[in-house]
Amino acid sequence: MMQPMRWLLVPLLLVACEAPPHLTNADGGTLCASAGSAWPEADALFQRDPAWLGADAAYTVDLGKARVLWLFGDTFIARGAVRQRTDAYFIRNSAALQSGSYDPSAASAKFAWKTGGTPSSWFPENGTSWHWPAGGVRLTTRLLLFWTIIHPASNAFGFEAAGPRVVSVDSPDSDPSSWAFTDVKFPTPAFPVALQAPVVSGTYLFVYAIREPGDHHVYIARVPLKGAEVGDFSGTTWYTPDRGWQDVANLGGEPAVVFPGAGTDNAPEFSVQAQKDGTFLAVQSVGFGATQIAVRTAPAPEGPWTAPCAVFQPSESSAQGAFVYAGKGHPGLLGADVVATYAANSLTSGKVLTDMSLYFPRFVKLTAP
């Protein structure tokens, strides 16, 4: 198996090791208008493949015509006919194509990674660096995929985030096995950020950014859709505290922090989606270890955003050594007002290798707030 114990530390790079915060909504209360429930019927989508033995991250992109691209982080691939992780291959990312229905409980999924010799990452490494997914968006004729570059490092974890990588696919209606990736330049601030949670609203593509490595402050950029459709991001601007939208040359400092809170209030993975009433909903995990899934709302992509409000506690958060993370919504999926997933791991050394109930993404049904 390939570096299993280094893998166990992977999410710790991106999460502050603090106790879960006290969750409140925007007016200081503790009640949420939304609620959640587990969805085991949909969980089966990830447990039918004989070789794909689980992964984290779990981002989706609606490709149209009941086709949904799933992007996963660190992944276990069976070495033979036996479905066990103790002797599995370990790769840095994988993908799946959901088809047949936008309802995951009624759909099928075809998983993908590079083959030939031994399994390898679906989105390939670059030398000694690898990539973790950070979401994507289907435009009219173009697919944009967002990744976080991870470098080896001499810190306690052995690696660190090293900025974003954005690639485009010009033929998203074709089979993913035939896709060619073209790098596009996305202007970012002078300090390192990870890009994710792209959402289209009006004539713009909005993209969120997390200061990483750093304090997990969340910022927002917008790109004219006309430019994004042809891979031109030169018109990208960032939302500032007092001067509106500015390009990177005129930022003059840090962009506006759009998510209130700090530490584990600001998860390294989250989603943002437009709601039917014109407002916006963010879904994330909050806390560390025994986390909850929480939501935020805002009237516009740049806010003002509410503080996170807990709506669901995964059953795995009650376990000894719980390590539950990667909560996010999936706006292209049907079966609930909001379909969300989370990843369940363990801080108990080696447990994820033997406990096959862990590390398959879990579905949650949320009611719209």
Predicted regions and their residues:
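Beta-rich carbohydrate-recognition and catalytic domains
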Residues: 23, 28-53, 63-129, 138-189, ...
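Bacterial signal peptide processing site
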Residues: 18-20
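Long, low-complexity, proline- and polar/charged-enriched segments
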Residues: 194-201, 209
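Hydrophobic core register within WD40 beta-propeller blades
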Residues: 60, 136, 198, 270-272, ...
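C-terminal motif of bacterial Sec signal peptides marking the signal peptidase cleavage site
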Residues: 14-16
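Repeated scaffold domains used in trafficking and secretory/extracellular systems
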Residues: 134, 188-197, 267-270, 324
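Sec-dependent signal peptide recognition
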Residues: 3-10
